[in-house]
């Protein structure tokens, strides 16, 4: 059962930085913080969230250290409803493969978290809301006080969708916390935290580059995972209109991959990825089809935010800098769309690694599509 408490004054938000009496203050009315924010998260939790816990009746027997999840919503008069550690969380996810009813879901099955609902809870759009949630030892805090003064802006966005994005960020936090140095090392080696790889493989890959070692250490695992997923990949590009023009060609690339014919597999797949991107660009009515614009196509079509596990902004950068990499005609050293298309990539570059990455790029593009499931 929820608890009901009464604030003397309904909170409006958190002050962004200290000000002196009489000075104007910037108030944060909507925010998401997670464990990676360190003391910023601690300060928020030790403020209003702790005050709420302290207001609960003694029979609740709840301490701040015991909070797994907390949901609070309140009106402008300060009348609040509080739920602590009693709600069932229902997540709506986008999955990598078909799942049967009753089948267990594992982290590696999840492409993204689209919604996070709390069963039996309805939050009025004119109420402020604060939610604390956990994933193991990780904590997340989301609040939206914009329906209250000074904004007085009734909530129109889907609260559960917002929470889903936040929870997804928490679930895949290490992917969002990749350092600039690690990103540079991944791009230099042609790798990306592809959704087609298991989270454990990606974490291992990040660990290698953080230790100044080669991301190629994960190639045997990555190749095995892609090979195991080929039947699912064939189903994916068979069921979406964007891929309908390319299915036969992509199937041929998959056939050559299974046969270990790396020259044929790469010769097919690298030019074909651009064809797929051209189809994707039509979803957002892109007019200019330069390579830099095509690199934006998945992001523009998806409507995804930075919190997505697909890392859409970084994938755009990857497409532009790695897939569409330019080359020195006198010394073409890397396989890319352009080195393959211009016939200057060396035979050594038509490797198993390049074929693995090519198929992973196709899958990553697929899951940017709005109706991809």
Please provide the spans of the model-predicted regions.
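Terminal, compositionally biased low-complexity regions
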Residues: 1-223
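Amphipathic, oligomerization/interface secondary-structure segments
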Residues: 178-184, 188-192, 232-233, 237-247, ...
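Generic amphipathic alpha-helical segments used as scaffolds and interaction surfaces in large
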Residues: 209, 220, 224, 237-240, ...
């Amino acid at each position: 059962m929820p608890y009901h408490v009464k604030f003397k004054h309904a909170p409006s938000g958190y002050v962004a930085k200290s000000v002196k009496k009489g000075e104007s203050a910037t108030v944060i009315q909507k925010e998401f913080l997670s464990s990676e924010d360190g003391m910023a998260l601690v300060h928020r939790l030790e403020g209003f969230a702790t005050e709420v816990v302290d207001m609960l009746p003694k029979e609740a027997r709840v301490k701040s250290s015991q909070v797994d999840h907390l949901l609070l919503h309140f009106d402008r008069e300060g009348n609040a409803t509080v739920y602590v550690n009693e709600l069932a969380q229902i997540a709506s996810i986008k999955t990598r493969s078909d799942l049967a009813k009753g089948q267990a879901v594992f982290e590696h099955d999840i492409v993204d978290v689209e919604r996070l609902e709390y069963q039996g809870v309805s939050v009025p759009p004119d109420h402020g809301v604060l939610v604390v949630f956990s994933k193991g030892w990780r904590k997340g805090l989301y609040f939206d006080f914009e329906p209250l003064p000074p904004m007085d802006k009734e909530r129109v966005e889907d609260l559960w969708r917002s929470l889903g994005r936040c929870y997804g960020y928490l679930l895949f936090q290490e992917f969002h916390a990749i350092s600039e140095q690690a990103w540079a090392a991944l791009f230099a080696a042609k790798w990306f935290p592809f959704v087609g790889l298991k989270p454990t493989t990606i974490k291992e890959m990040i660990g290698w580059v953080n230790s100044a070692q080669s991301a190629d250490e994960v190639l045997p695992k990555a190749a095995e995972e892609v090979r195991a997923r080929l039947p699912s990949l064939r189903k994916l590009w068979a069921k979406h209109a964007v891929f309908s023009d390319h299915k036969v060609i992509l199937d041929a690339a998959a056939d050559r991959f299974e046969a270990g014919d790396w020259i044929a597999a790469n010769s097919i797949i690298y030019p074909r990825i651009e064809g797929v991107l051209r189809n994707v660009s039509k979803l957002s009515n892109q007019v200019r089809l330069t390579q830099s614009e095509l690199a934006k196509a998945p992001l523009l079509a998806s409507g995804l935010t930075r919190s997505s596990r697909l890392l859409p902004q970084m994938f755009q950068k990857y497409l532009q800098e790695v897939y569409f990499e330019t080359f020195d005609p006198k010394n073409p050293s890397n396989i890319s769309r352009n080195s393959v298309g211009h016939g200057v990539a060396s035979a050594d570059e038509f490797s198993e690694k390049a074929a693995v990455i090519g198929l992973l790029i196709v899958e990553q593009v697929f899951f940017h599509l709005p109706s991809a499931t």
